[in-house]
Amino acid sequence: MAKNIQAIRGMNDYLPGETAIWQRIEGTLKNVLGSYGYSEIRLPIVEQTPLFKRAIGEVTDVVEKEMYTFEDRNGDSLTLRPEGTAGCVRAGIEHGLLYNQEQRLWYIGPMFRHERPQKGRYRQFHQLGCEVFGLQGPDIDAELIMLTARWWRALGIFEHVTLELNSIGSLEARANYRDALVAFLEQHKEKLDEDCKRRMYTNPLRVLDSKNPEVQALLNDAPALGDYLDEESREHFAGLCKLLESAGIAYTVNQRLVRGLDYYNRTVFEWVTNSLGSQGTVCAGGRYDGLVEQLGGRATPAVGFAMGLERLVLLVQAVNPEFKADPVVDIYLVASGADTQSAAMALAERLRDELLGVKLMTNHGGGNFKKQFARADKWGARVAVVLGESEVANGTAVVKDLRSGEQTAVAQDSVAAHLRTLLG
């Protein structure tokens, strides 16, 4: 017997029982995006490796440790995308979408990072990202956060997420803070773990994000990023906070929030939750006004965020069990008798024409009425339409409400109208 081939560790299959809830959640997210006037962009899964090195930063964990990189047959270095922003910016530059233009874009799809698989974090994971180009005021930062808050309300998880905000200032202000932070860390080098010692010179702001309790205790005495902000960044952040307060969105200022990618400036934010065990990030983003120019385009203000769908699905299932997947089937067509199958299939096609958007499944494979009604229950159908030999001969069908058990014989020409009434 041939050996079974299994999925790669950390890259999961999502079976029909799982994809139904994903589809409902994704539908909710897309409806909200449409209500704000955002447009979908579809991007390649594979990009040239230098794109991510230039965008994310060569000394980030993502580039150093986590990317799936390989050479193709031409000897070019290619990478499975670890995030979506860099590819979105690349596409915007390549197709002339950005310079002197305003764009509100979103994308959804798989990303890849070679991390240790754990609950809600996998090597292939799915992200929905949102990117806005050409707008530089705090009002668009606020709109993105308000959009995400609308998602949480629609999904019934608003009470289980908390917004954390920070401003990391301009590139110049951050460089000044970096120097002060490195000087402080050098004085306390013996208290740092090996990872923080390495980051101290390559990417010192990432030390602020250390999960080591001893390092976090040390950082209580470190210089504060807020003390090094330029005046323009202070005003931008104050404007954002005021807009969020006006919108009734509570937030916490977290001066150690810096984000893991090098391209951010000014606003950074995260929505976090404690409802999945240890605190986890549900959605995160910020402003990256220098990235378009860094990747070869003209200077263009930009802001965006990304959200991991695996973690979002887990959170919705954990805190809002009433948020159910839509049924796979609304109507199940039961047919029994030697000459009924072709008539049943013809009726099913007529009903699909007349009841657009209704999900109708026709029984195939035979079976008595009892077995066919059991299949209707399995698929979650609300209504069964029954055709036997006598119904075919009389031009009728029996319509049965599977919730109440009531059934009615109806002329086949009137079945669609009767079903509309039953299904609401």
UniProtKB/Swiss-Prot annotation:
Q: Mind listing the GO biological process terms from this record? A: histidyl-tRNA aminoacylation
Q: Which UniProt keywords apply?
A: Aminoacyl-tRNA synthetase, ATP-binding, Cytoplasm, Ligase, Nucleotide-binding, Protein biosynthesis
Gene Ontology MF terms in the entry? ATP binding; histidine-tRNA ligase activity
What EC number(s) would the UniProt record show? Answer: 6.1.1.21
A Pfam family found in this protein is tRNA-synt_His
Q: Name one GO cellular component term.
A: cytoplasm
Compartment(s) of residence: Cytoplasm
Gene3D superfamilies on file? Anticodon-binding domain, Bira Bifunctional Protein, Domain 2
Q: What chemistry does it catalyse, as a reaction equation? A: tRNA(His) + L-histidine + ATP = L-histidyl-tRNA(His) + AMP + diphosphate + H(+)
CDD domains linked to this entry: HisRS-like_core, HisRS_anticodon
User: Major place of localization?
Assistant: cytoplasm
Its subunit composition reads: Homodimer.
| Family per record | Belongs to the class-II aminoacyl-tRNA synthetase family.
Q: What is the protein name given in its UniProt record? A: Histidine--tRNA ligase
Question: What organism, scientifically named, is this protein from?
Answer: Shigella flexneri
